[in-house]
C-alpha cells in the first residue's frame, strides 16, 4: 500500500474511485483497528478529524483514535435534541480522554426551525431528511471545511445495520478520505475493548437502548426489533452524515 492522491481520486467517477481503492481495502481488511489508524495517519493527507455522535459505543473509537493521535479534532453535530444523558456522557468522555471537541450546530436554532417548518421528524421520510440535512449534514460539511479536513475517521460497524454491511475500511465521502477502523468489529469485540480500557457504554445502554440519537426519533429496543428499527421510527437508519 502506498500514499494515495486525494485530488486525483476525487477527479474519478464514483465507481472508478471504489475500484482504485479496492487493493488498498483488501490490505486494510487484514489489519487490526489500531494498525488501520496508524496506516491512515502515515499514508493519508491531513488535516485529520474524528466524528462522533457520542452514542452507545462511542468511547471505543474516541479512545482508539485519540490514543494514537492525541488532540485530533473530534466533531460533534449537536441538534439541540440530544438526551440529557448524552450531554452528560459528552462531558464525561471529553474530560476523561482529554478530547479536542469541536461542536457544530445548525445556523437556525431548534426553536426557530420548529416555528418555520413544524416538527420535521413527524413529517415522514422527507421531513426527516430535511431535518437531518439542516442539523447534521450542513454542520458536518461546515466542520470539514473549517478544519481543512482531508481524512475523516468514524466509528461505524457493519453489524449495526443493513445499510452498513458492505462498507469498506477506506472510502471517499464529501471529497475527503473516510476511514472506518472498527468496521468489522462485533458487539463482543466492542465490549471487550471497553472492559480492557476501563471505558463505559452510554448511560442509556443500561436502560435498553441499542442506538441513541435525538430524543424524538430514538426508542428503546424491544424483543423482535432490529437495532436499526430503534431510530427514525424504522423509516431509515442513517442520519445523513454517512450517506453519499
Swiss-Prot record:
Keyword terms: Cytoplasm, Oxidoreductase
Reaction(s) the record says it catalyses: [thioredoxin]-disulfide + sulfite + adenosine 3',5'-bisphosphate + 2 H(+) = [thioredoxin]-dithiol + 3'-phosphoadenylyl sulfate
One Gene Ontology CC term in the entry: cytoplasm
Enzyme Commission number(s): 1.8.4.8
BP GO annotations: hydrogen sulfide biosynthetic process; sulfate assimilation, phosphoadenylyl sulfate reduction by phosphoadenylyl-sulfate reductase (thioredoxin)
Chief site of localization: cytoplasm
Known pathway: Sulfur metabolism; hydrogen sulfide biosynthesis; sulfite from sulfate: step 3/3
Domain of life per record: Bacteria
Task of the protein: Catalyzes the formation of sulfite from phosphoadenosine 5'-phosphosulfate (PAPS) using thioredoxin as an electron donor.
Similarity annotation: Belongs to the PAPS reductase family. CysH subfamily.
Protein name as it appears in the record: Phosphoadenosine 5'-phosphosulfate reductase
